[in-house]
């Protein structure tokens, strides 16, 4: 009798341990990436590049190519891709990149040991225009529960779900992803911008997408909230549209130099100082989620302007936008800025792919 009870007890304990271990595995993908990002931050900040393996300054769609790798000898630690168009069921995204190729390159970079981030520029669900169709103030309202286009947007979110569900490694485990929806929402150029919806509507939009994906089992997403460069934003203003500490893992900043160098440096430091204080006090990661100087008219920009500012803050990574024939933000072989880019990434605190491999 006693032996029988002991056997049953041991069996139940073994079953409980198995269930708990399975639960840990199922819930740990996001946390594993968060822990990895925190550990890497001790060594410096990673370099990232948007659409790195798809096209460059002088080439397009050739497999195995990368302007960054051909310039520096290594891939970026972080690669960024965009899902704009997936909501419509399109075969290609808003930059004409086939979604099948995005999936292929995303998984390849994960296998290399790199980190991937996804943004999403969905079309305007009210007018059918682009993400930059920003003339209406009722678009967000129309897709929230009870809104005219809520059912349509549910279908759009399902298309995002379907793409994300196919991002699995060789062991059929979900690939960890930094997910960065609704970026630059403090600006007024997207239909989800500050002049296009109220803070309450924006919160509801964020929660609707996040709750939907969590309900579908996507616990592999590190959620990034990334407003645009302001230069005069207080913590109170930042918090007006911030979804909340329980909904954000990584605080980002999109910060391009469109004006003078002096203005850029002043604005970048003002915003990063405020965001650093908040991130440190609230246990959040911090990154420059988009940045760059279009076409790099000043080749020394990497080492003379950008890096001295980044060195002042506890950043996880910085990501420059894409290289294309009509515009480029990263290095390319033969360009004058390549020398200064290589000088920057050879610094001990700037991490490329080889520096973060497990």
Regions found by a protein language model. Give the residues of each.
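Acidic-and-aromatic substrate-binding clefts and catalytic sites of carbohydrate-active enzymes
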Residues: 53-61, 86-100, 228-236, 256-269, ...
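Substrate-binding cleft of extracellular glycoside hydrolase catalytic domains
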Residues: 88-218
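Substrate-binding cleft of secreted/luminal carbohydrate-active enzymes
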Residues: 45-51, 284-358
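Alpha-helical scaffolding within the catalytic cores
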Residues: 31-33, 59-68, 100-104, 160-163, ...
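Aromatic-lined carbohydrate-recognition surfaces of secreted/lumenal glycan-active proteins
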Residues: 48-50, 180-182, 206-236, 283-297, ...
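Bacterial Sec-dependent N-terminal signal peptides
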Residues: 1-27
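Aromatic- and acid-rich polysaccharide-binding/catalytic face
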Residues: 81, 238-265, 321-323
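N-terminal module-boundary/linker segments of secreted carbohydrate-active enzymes
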Residues: 26-78, 84, 92-96, 306, ...
């Amino acid at each position: 009798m006693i032996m029988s009870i002991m056997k049953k007890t041991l069996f139940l304990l073994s079953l409980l341990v198995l269930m708990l271990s399975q639960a840990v595995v199922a819930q740990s993908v996001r946390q594993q990436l968060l822990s990895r990002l925190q550990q890497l931050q001790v060594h410096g900040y990673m370099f990232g590049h948007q659409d790195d393996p798809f096209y460059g300054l002088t080439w397009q769609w050739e497999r195995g190519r990368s302007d960054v790798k051909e310039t520096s000898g290594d891939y970026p630690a972080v690669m960024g891709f965009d899902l704009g168009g997936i909501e419509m069921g399109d075969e290609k995204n808003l930059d004409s990149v086939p979604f099948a190729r995005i999936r292929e390159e995303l998984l390849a970079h994960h296998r290399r040991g790199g980190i991937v981030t996804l943004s999403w520029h969905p079309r305007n669900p009210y007018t059918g225009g682009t993400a930059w169709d920003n003339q209406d103030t009722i678009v967000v309202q129309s897709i929230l529960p009870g809104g005219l286009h809520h059912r349509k947007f549910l279908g759009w979110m399902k298309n995002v779900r379907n793409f994300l569900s196919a991002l699995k490694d060789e062991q059929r485990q979900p690939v960890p992803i930094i997910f960065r929806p609704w970026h630059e929402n403090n600006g007024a150029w997207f239909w989800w911008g500050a002049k296009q919806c109220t803070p309450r509507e924006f919160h509801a939009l964020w929660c609707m997408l996040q709750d939907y994906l969590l309900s579908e089992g996507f616990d592999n997403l590190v959620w990034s909230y990334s407003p645009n460069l302001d230069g005069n934003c207080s913590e109170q203003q930042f918090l007006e549209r911030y979804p909340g500490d329980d909904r954000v893992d990584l605080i980002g900043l999109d910060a391009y130099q469109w004006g003078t160098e002096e203005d850029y440096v002043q604005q970048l430091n003002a915003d990063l100082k405020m965001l650093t204080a908040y991130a440190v006090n609230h246990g959040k990661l911090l990154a420059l989620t988009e940045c760059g100087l279009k076409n790099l008219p000043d080749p020394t920009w990497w080492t003379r302007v950008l890096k001295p500012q980044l060195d002042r803050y506890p950043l996880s990574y910085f990501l420059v936008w894409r290289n294309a024939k009509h515009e480029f933000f990263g290095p390319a072989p033969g360009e004058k800025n390549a020398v200064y880019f290589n000088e920057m990434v050879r610094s001990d605190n700037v991490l490329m792919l080889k520096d973060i491999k497990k």
